[in-house]
């Protein structure tokens, strides 16, 4: 994968996260704040806990930091998904789980 291909895929992922935050705020009482700075999105929940998602261009990875830990994801073209580098699942499924754990509400994130 070229750097530009990575950046395009990573941008789609971050945009999907931001759009899901808007949808979640419209549909629930989650009061979820998505703060975007360059290649990083910080999700801030009503209880002030955070999840940080950022691009790691040199490694062609997306990193996710949550209370549950730090996780690295690489894009798998065959599956069309961002997968944990240690085999712990797909990015959006994991983000949904970690956001639910941290917010105390059932929150769902998905790829576009």
From Swiss-Prot:
Q: Which GO terms describe its biological process?
A: iron-sulfur cluster assembly
Q: Name one GO cellular component term.
A: cytosol
Keyword Metal-binding listed:
yes
The terms under GO molecular function for this entry are: ferric iron binding; ferrous iron binding
Lineage: superkingdom: Bacteria
What does the function comment of this entry state? Answer: Involved in iron-sulfur (Fe-S) cluster assembly. May act as a regulator of Fe-S biogenesis.
Name used for this protein in its record: Iron-sulfur cluster assembly protein CyaY
The species is Delftia acidovorans (strain DSM 14801 / SPH-1)
């Amino acid at each position: 994968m070229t750097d530009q291909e990575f950046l395009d895929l990573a941008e789609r992922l971050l945009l999907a996260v931001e759009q899901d935050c808007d949808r979640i705020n419209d549909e629930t009482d989650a009061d979820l704040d998505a703060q975007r700075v360059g290649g990083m999105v910080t999700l801030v929940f009503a209880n002030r806990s955070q999840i940080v998602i950022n691009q790691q261009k040199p490694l062609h990875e997306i990193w996710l930091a949550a209370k549950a830990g730090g996780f690295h994801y690489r894009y798998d073209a065959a599956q069309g998904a961002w997968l944990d580098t240690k085999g712990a699942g797909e990015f959006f499924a994991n983000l949904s789980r970690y956001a639910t754990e941290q917010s105390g509400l059932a929150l769902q994130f998905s790829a576009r």
